[in-house]
Amino acid sequence: MAVRSPFVVVMGHVDVGKTLLLDKIRGTSVAYREPGMITQHIGMSFVPWQAVEKYAGPLVDRLKLRGKIWIPGFLFIDTPGHAAFSNLRKRGGSVADLAILVVDITSGLEDQGVESLKLIQSRGVPFVIAANKLDRVYGWKSVENRPFLTAVEDQEWHAIATLEESIGKLVEQLSKLGVEADRYDRVRDFGRQVPIVPTSAVTGEGIADLLLVLAGVSQRFIPRDKLTVRPGPARGVVMEVKEERGLGVVADAILYDGVLKKGDTVVTAGIDGPRVAKVRMLVMPKPLEEMRDPEDRYMAVEEVKAAAGVRIVADGLEGVVAGAPLMAVRDPGEVQEAVKVVGEEISEIKIETDREGVIVRADTFGTLESTVLFLRQQGVPIRKADVGPPTHKDVVEAVLSRRKNPAYGVILAFNVKTPPEVEKEAMSSGVKIIRGEILYRIFDEYIKWSQEVKTKTVEQILSQMTRPGKIQILPGYVFRRSNPAIVGVKVLAGTIKPGVTLVKDGKEVGRVMQIQKSGKPVGEAAAGDEVAVSIQGDVMVGRQIKEGDVLYVYVPDEQARQWLFQYKQYLREDELKALEEFLKAGRRR
C-alpha cells in the first residue's frame, strides 16, 4: 500500500516568523520542482523529498541521508498556529504527524510558545524547534539559502559567542519545562533530546537543515503504518467551513486515509451533532504549470486520494464546525453506523464532567478540546464545554455554578462572539464573559478576575465577622460606674468596634455602645489606642469589672473556627494572639 507524506504544522508565539518561515519552505518546493511533480492542495503545501534533496544538495550527503528517506515529502498546513493544530484532531490523537515550534532566537520561548509546546506534548506529536531570526544575531554574516552547518563555519567568534549564549538560554528555558534539547548537530540521542535548528525566514539560512532534520525525525518516530494509506472511503477532518460564491457552503478538509469520490455521502458534525451530506463536487487547485489566470485557480475532480487537502461542495454542510471528523460512506446501509461513530467522537469533546466549574465555549471542536485540556492542566474545573457562541442556558449554568463558588460564575469564550441578548442577560445576572483569540490571555484574564472576585468575597465575609480584640480598663479612668458603664481603656491587641460583646474570664459583661477618642466618636480602635468606651449591660464597675481588668471581644464559636482554619492569614499577629487567649479563657471556664 502507498505511503503518504506526513502532515506538518508550524506553531509558536506571535511575530516569531511562522508565516514567513512557511513561505520560505513553500518557495523551495516551487523553485526546485520538476515538471508535473508538484501537486497543489487546498489549505496545504506539498514539499516533495526530491525537491528537498535538490535544494539541500551537499548537506544531504554530509548528514548521510541520501537514499535513506522513504517518505514522499511533507504536507505543510498553510495556516500556522494553535487553532490549525487543534483542529487537526482525531480520536486517540492528532492528524498532525510533525510540528515545528518556531522560537525567536533573540528573545527565547515566550507565552504562546510555551502554550504551543504543551499542546504539542499533550497530543504526543514529534517536534523540531526552529530557532528563527538567525540573521538578527549580532555580527552574523548572512548568505541566502545557506545551510546552517555551512554558515556557522564562516562566522567571526563574537557572532558564534552570541549565538551560543542565545541557544544556551533557550535550552535552559526548555529544561525548566521538562524538555531536554540541544543544537541539532550536537544531539546524540533523538529519542531523548529535541533538536534545535537555527534558521532565518528572511535569508533562508538553516531551512535546508530544518527540512532534513524533519525528515530524520519523521523516519525515526512516525510508524510506517501510520503513514500507510488504506483503500476504501476517505477519513479526514474539516479545517474550515465557508460560503463560496456560486458554490454555496463548502468545507475545506484534510484527508488522511482512503479515497473521496464525487457522489459519496459524507458524515461530519455541527454544533448540534452529526451531519450527513451528499458530495456534489470536489475542488482542487490546478497544477502550478496550468495556473495562467489568478482568477481561474481551481478545477473540479472526480476523486481525491489521501493524503490531500480538498474543497468539498455538498448539500447539507450548513452548520458544520471546523475540527469535526469526516467519514465518507458509499453503502447507504453504513450511514447510520458512521453517524454513530462521529457522534461518539464529538461527545468525547463536549464534556460536562465537573459538578461545579466554569463554562467554556470555543469556535471549533479542535479548539474546544485544546482549550479544555489547557484549563484542566491549570487546575480550572469545567462545568460545561461546547462549540459555538454562549447561550441563555450557559448563563443559567454559570449562575448555578456561582452559588457554590463566585469564581465559577464566568463564561470563557475562545474565538466566538456573544449574541447581544446573551451579553445583556449575563450582565444583568452578574455573569462574567471573558472572550479572546489567544488562549493564555483568556486564562490570565480569568485568573486576574477570579482573584478579584475571591478578594471581594473574602472582604464581604470578613466584614460580617467579629475581629478578635483585647482591652484593659485604665486605672483612674472610670467616668460612670453603670447603665451604661463608661471607662477609659487601652487596646492591647486586635480591634474593638461599637456593637461587640466583651467578656471577662469567659463570661459576658456587656456590649460596647460607643467609642470616643479625644472626645469624638470613632468607628473602631486598634492595638495601642487609648479610648473611652460605653458598655451597656448588667455590669457595674467595682463589681463585675474593675480597674485594671483585661477584657476580650467575644467571638462566636463558628467564627472562631473560620478565623483559625479558613481565614487565619487575614489576622494580624496580635489579633491571632488575642483570639487564642480568648478561647483558652473560655475553656478554663
Swiss-Prot record:
Alphabetical list of InterPro entries matching this protein: EFTU-type, P-loop_NTPase, Small_GTP-bd, T_Tr_GTP-bd_dom, TF_aIF-2_arc, TIF_IF2, TIF_IF2_dom3, TIF_IF2_dom3_sf
Gene3D superfamilies: P-loop containing nucleotide triphosphate hydrolases, Translation factors, Translation initiation factor IF- 2, domain 3
GO cellular component: cytoplasm
Residues of the signal peptide: none
Region annotated G4, chain positions: 132-135
Residues involved in GTP binding: 12-19, 78-82, 132-135
Taxonomic superkingdom: Archaea
Region (G3): 78-81
A GO MF label: GTP binding
Keyword Nucleotide-binding: yes
tr-type G domain residues: 3-224
PANTHER family (alphabetical): EUKARYOTIC TRANSLATION INITIATION FACTOR 5B, TRANSLATION INITIATION FACTOR IF-2-RELATED
The protein's name in its UniProt record: Probable translation initiation factor IF-2
Species, as recorded: Pyrobaculum neutrophilum (strain DSM 2338 / JCM 9278 / NBRC 100436 / V24Sta)
Name of encoding gene: infB
